[in-house]
């Protein structure tokens, strides 16, 4: 019973926030135009600031390179295995890259990081934020590769220069690396010189950053709910089922199963919470505009976000319940 309550308490707030966003849309409080503008605010301002604030507080000694290595190896294996599978499943050329992206690219920044906090408090949130410095850039690089190299119906080729520029200009990556730069300066320059300075010393500035950071998660979840569009797309049924089940069932079963069987004593509870956040969450919302920009099947991309989010409400609960029963938390 304790494991059931633990899992429900971790997952329910996130699911309910998304439901509230959908309800606001239905009663006219959040229309499509508002949702688009709010989404831009979240990903261009609030989320980068949140990542900056969380990473800024960490110490270099907090970084577990072994754990990060496991996550990156798992990500690249998933990416590699998904390509031949999607080539077999996808009915059209412009669906292959969309499916591949859906399988490896979880909603880590939007749903995963707050989920890690729900699962294991500030320690879980910190572990997830530290991993984001490595995982989010890799998500973006692999997404661009999958959508360009695996083909699209537009026939356009994306130049390597554009790929690099898009990655560098990504607001989340800017927030992450700005924080890492500050941590490095503080640890390697200021502290050895006997200077103890943090942004919290400048109270007005730090409070403004905290205000913006605190807006990121609740607004992002409300917007996610407001952007839900349910539609039956018979022609995409095979791809939707395959992409949704692979993203929400097969990937977490493999990554978390291996971690539990072979690294249970090695990984902490906060790190298991981070694994759930990184590999059990639904398809990333930003995958849709990226597909649209690069000539993929936008309808499929949108439906994969919707259906994987719905299914993950159940699968994340079950994963959390099983890990709690097994003593990972």
Regions found by a protein language model. Name each.
Residues 1-329:
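Alpha-helical transmembrane segments of multi-pass small-molecule/ion transporters
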């Amino acid at each position: 019973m304790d494991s059931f309550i633990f899992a429900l308490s971790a997952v329910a707030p996130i699911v309910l926030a998304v439901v509230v966003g959908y309800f606001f849309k239905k009663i006219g409080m959040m229309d499509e135009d508002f949702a688009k503008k709010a989404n831009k605010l979240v990903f261009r301002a609030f989320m980068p600031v949140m990542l900056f604030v969380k990473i800024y507080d960490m110490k270099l000694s907090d970084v577990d390179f072994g754990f990060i290595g496991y996550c990156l190896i798992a990500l690249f294996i998933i990416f590699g295995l998904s390509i031949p599978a999607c080539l077999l499943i996808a009915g059209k050329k412009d669906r292959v890259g969309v499916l591949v992206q859906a399988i490896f690219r979880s909603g880590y920044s939007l749903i995963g990081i707050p989920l890690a906090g729900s699962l294991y408090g500030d320690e879980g949130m910190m572990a997830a934020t530290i991993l984001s410095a490595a995982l989010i850039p890799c998500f973006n690089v692999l997404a661009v590769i999958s959508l360009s190299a695996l083909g699209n119906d537009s026939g356009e080729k994306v130049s390597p220069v554009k790929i690099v520029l898009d990655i560098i200009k990504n607001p989340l990556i800017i927030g992450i690396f700005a924080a890492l730069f500050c941590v490095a300066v503080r640890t390697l320059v200021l502290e050895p010189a006997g200077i103890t300075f943090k942004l919290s010393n400048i109270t007005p500035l730090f409070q403004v950053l905290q205000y913006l950071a605190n807006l990121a998660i609740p607004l992002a979840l409300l917007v996610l709910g407001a952007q839900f569009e349910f539609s039956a797309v018979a022609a995409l049924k095979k791809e939707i089922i395959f992409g949704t089940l692979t993203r929400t069932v097969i990937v977490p079963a493999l990554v978390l199963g291996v971690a539990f069987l072979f690294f249970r004593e090695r990984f902490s509870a906060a790190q298991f919470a981070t694994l759930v956040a990184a590999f059990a969450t639904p398809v990333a919302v930003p995958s849709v505009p990226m597909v649209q920009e690069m000539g993929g099947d936008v309808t499929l991309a949108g439906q994969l976000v919707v259906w994987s989010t719905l299914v993950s409400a159940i699968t994340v609960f079950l994963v959390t319940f099983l890990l709690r029963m097994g003593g990972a938390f």
